[in-house]
A protein has these predicted regions:
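Glycine-rich acetyl-CoA-binding "A-motif" of GNAT/NAT acetyltransferases
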Residues: 73-76, 136, 163
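Active-site acidic-Proline motif in GNAT/NAT acetyltransferases
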Residues: 98-104, 133
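Conserved acetyl-CoA-binding loop-helix of GNAT-fold acetyltransferases
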Residues: 103-117, 139, 143
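Conserved GNAT acetyl-CoA-binding A-motif
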Residues: 120-130
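Conserved catalytic-core motifs of GNAT/GCN5-like acyltransferases
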Residues: 129, 147-164
């Protein structure tokens, strides 16, 4: 199931390509376009911290990262995280898109592509773990039909030292089928 999950995906001009070393410099430029956003992320992809975070993302166990492309242009990143074969679950996270494509429906298309694929290969549950302060991302997953299950209090310490409360959102396969 998880071998089939981490596949390159596409829908017209939207493509998810397995993130690789060859994407480093293009992604560095994309992430630098919104340096103010990184304090609400667990790790920073700002210019000062980019290389360490990129190395962790592409080399980390339990992480299946993608470069997000709009045509031939790299516009962001996302990943499958926390695969749990016994629960047939996965998290979608580490998502960032360039400010130019926010508010255009691109992120909704991206998430729907990932969700459709995950459920097609046998995943039963998809989670989104979002910093409570990140209202934009919470609104986006609510719009997809996800359910907020609660808040994991003091769940992690971010790169800034902030003790983060994490909103836990989920979507089940049978819920998605009913919405599609």
């Amino acid at each position: 199931m998880y071998d089939d999950l981490y596949a390159e995906l596409g829908d017209g001009d939207l493509r998810l390509v397995k993130l690789a070393e060859t994407h480093r410099e293009a992604l560095r430029a994309v992430c630098a376009a919104d340096a103010d956003i990184w304090p609400i992320y667990s790790s920073s992809f700002d210019p000062e911290h980019f290389d360490k975070s990129f190395d962790t993302l592409i080399g980390g166990a339990g992480r299946m990262p993608y470069g997000i492309f709009d045509g031939d242009r790299l516009v962001g990143m996302t990943a499958w995280l926390r695969p749990d074969p016994s629960a047939q679950s996965i998290e979608i996270g580490n998502s960032f898109i360039h400010p130019d494509v926010r508010g255009t429906g691109f992120n909704g298309r991206l998430k729907k592509l990932m969700i459709d694929h995950a459920f097609a290969v046998g995943i039963r549950r998809i989670e989104f773990r979002i910093d409570e302060r990140n209202k934009r991302s919470q609104a986006a997953v609510a719009k997809l039909g996800c359910t907020k299950e609660g808040t994991l209090r003091s769940e992690r310490i971010t790169w800034t030292g902030h003790v983060r409360d994490t909103a836990l959102w989920s979507l089940l396969a049978d819920e998605w089928v009913g919405r599609r």
